[in-house]
């Protein structure tokens, strides 16, 4: 299985006025639609452990305190096809129990259905990581999957 889990199974995006955001166990992805023809020099992006700010052509698009902490040194942004800015943030808490319910503390919350789908996806990703010989990319999950699902780590092998 060479492709990452999210490439095989898809992502659960949360739509916003400027684009969308989604998450994996380890990262949060922010995709911002910008005017076609935007150049990298038109973009100002500030990434800190708990804050993000993005302006394009002097117009503020996104600014605020993140839902949870990230590793500031590992955050990156790219301009893709001169029409989309992709920001990738690395979570400090990288487990299925750490499902972000919103991008910022007070904005861009996922609705309850999307939150549920995000939690299911992170739990399946956790199972994939714990059982690399199996392919969970097309699996469905029900039952106890909130907060990362059941903990089997202390069962006898």
From Swiss-Prot:
Its main location: nucleus. SUPFAM superfamilies: HSP20-like chaperones. PROSITE patterns: CS (PS51203). It comes from the Eukaryota. It holds the Pfam family CS. It is found in: Chromosome, Centromere, Kinetochore; Cytoplasm, Cytoskeleton, Microtubule organizing center, Centrosome; Cytoplasm, Cytoskeleton, Spindle pole. This is NudC domain-containing protein 2. It comes from Homo sapiens.
């Amino acid at each position: 299985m060479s492709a990452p889990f999210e490439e095989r199974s898809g992502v659960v995006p949360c739509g916003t006025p400027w684009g969308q955001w989604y998450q994996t166990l380890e990262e949060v992805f922010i995709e911002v639609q910008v005017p076609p023809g935007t150049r990298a020099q038109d973009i100002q992006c500030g990434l800190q452990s708990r804050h993000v700010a993005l302006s394009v052509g002097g117009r503020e698009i996104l600014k605020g305190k993140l839902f949870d902490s990230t590793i500031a040194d590992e955050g990156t942004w790219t301009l893709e096809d001169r029409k989309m800015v992709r920001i990738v943030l690395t979570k400090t808490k990288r487990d299925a129990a750490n499902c972000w319910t919103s991008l910022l503390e007070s904005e861009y919350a996922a609705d309850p259905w999307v939150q549920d789908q995000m939690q299911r996806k992170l739990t399946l990703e956790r199972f994939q990581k714990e059982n690399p010989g199996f392919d969970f990319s097309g699996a469905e999950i029900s039952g106890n999957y909130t907060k990362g699902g059941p903990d089997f780590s202390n069962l006898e092998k």
